Amino acid sequence: MSSSDGGSSRVSIPYHLRKTLQKIREYTGKQHSDEDIFAVYKDSFNDPHETAQKLLFLDTFHEVRSKREKKKEPIVPVTQPSGRGGRRNFASSNSYQGSGRNASFKRENGANHVTRGSRTAQPATNKASNITVPNETKVSGPASIPSEVSNHKAQDDPSLISASRCSSKSDQAIEIETASKQGKNQSLPKPDVSEQSHVTFPFHLQVAKGLQNGLTFGSFDSNFVKEVSSSNGASGGYDSNFESSHGTGDDERESSPTTNGITGVASAREETSTVSEDKDYGISNSATGAEPVVHSDHIVPPVEEVPKEEALSNTETHQIAYGQEAPLSVFGLVPSLSAIGQPVNTEAAETQPGNSNSPPISLVSYPPDQSSIAAATQQTNFLRQQYPPNFFPYGYYSPYYMPPPYIHQFLSPNGIPQQSYFPQGAALTAPSHAKPVDNTENPPTTNPYLHTSPMVASSIPSTTTLNSIHSEEKASHLTESAAAWIGQGFGNLQVNPMYNLAYQGQPLGFPVVQAGHGGLMGMHQPTQPMAAASTTYQTLPPPPHTTTAMGEPIGHPHIAYQQPQAALTNWVNNY
């Protein structure tokens, strides 16, 4: 491996660098050859430290070549496969006749068009590989020559074709096509086409011929659309390709103008591969210039219709993808016209040449001006409201419930206060003819809460009597002792937890019921009380603090308790 063995090194290593290379090998601990170390040493700009670091991360079996070796080697893409028929191989003929490694590399990457087209015989190993792998035997002439060249004819078993017959037919086809193209002054394709390899498709996938002919790695651009559309023109490129691939004569081959040279190669390969896979088709090609006769029960579409339909769908699909930007031209948000129910223009598909038998296709390529006008008809309001009309985003609801007449601006978005359930106190004005008098005697045990008024202590009065008592008591306490009766004076206030008012002497269970009626006015409908509600309240036991002396103003809050009782009776009459 080293250069000290004598003559094994292909690169001359200076004598003063051999010790340095030996030290680098000892430092790395890997058995790299002197050529590898010297190549890394040159790449590292003669820095031994960087060379050692690179060799530490370099595998021992990794092949390191110098720049001089790389220049001598032919430019062959290593990572590109051969495809279905080995369409692409761009190495020269001398590289095929080189060492065994190069020959195996060529065998992996597919057939070399130039060398296999010109060779009259092949080795036995290559013939065996061609028989087992039918992809390499179906190769036509060189891919760089724009023609419809075929070196095979469809037969029942293409593996029985001899190598000499293939080579002679390919040589004859190359000479005829070269002469015809020189007579028409058609130049060869640009070299940038040959720098890309075809996209490979499996045998079990039925791919359109337009994709097989023009699809290469990196070919998705505007030129690809033009090439496919030109091959589908009024000159009938696919018809001429099919005729020339079956050998219809020299005159017909000369009268078939095509601009895409790969079309004939792929079409011939597709026809041959189709016949080799489907053994049911018995195609007789004994006579030159005869059309293929199908002896089978299978229904095969006509030859002239299938390529047209496939090429039409292919061309229109790519024209939509690359030829125009509508119907998604309005900020990328407007859907297509066919998706929203707009009429789709199908005249463009009908006016194309060779499309009389094809069904109407919904995907039609619109011109840029027509599609932009159609998309502009949709009314798009960019200054619309964020919320629907029935949504009020500025209505704030506080954590606790607040009645409508007081802070209505937080509860309703329109700012109009809602009507309160209770009538105002000014409307209930009546002449005061009775006043509550403090009782010095003990109150009766059967009706303890009505002991402040001797008129109502005996029995339940009528509705008019209660209304008059309610009005006169409110008027009397508002005028005489308003400072001591704040809770009763503002009787129209709706009781709720916001005010935190603790009335003197009120029972604990009853104000909760009143607060529920008044505070939850807008949320709950008031229920109609029973007729015997007053008798129910009279049977309640008295609170403990009512047994105190009656000389103090403790007895007055009992009148405040009597007022809501009259209000309940008013609800029954007004309802």
From Swiss-Prot:
GO terms for cellular component: nucleus. Residues 268-281 have a biased composition (Basic and acidic residues). Keywords: Nucleus. Expressed in roots, leaves, stems and flowers. It is found in: Nucleus. Residues 66-171, 229-296 are annotated as: Disordered. Residues 90-102, 115-138, 161-171 have a biased composition (Polar residues). InterPro entries: GIP1 (IPR044277), GIP1_N (IPR009719), UBA-like_sf (IPR009060). Pfam families: GIP1_N (PF06972). Belongs to the GIP1 family. May act as a transcriptional coactivator of LOB domain-containing proteins. This is GBF-interacting protein 1-like. It comes from Arabidopsis thaliana. The lineage of its organism: Eukaryota, Viridiplantae, Streptophyta, Embryophyta, Tracheophyta.
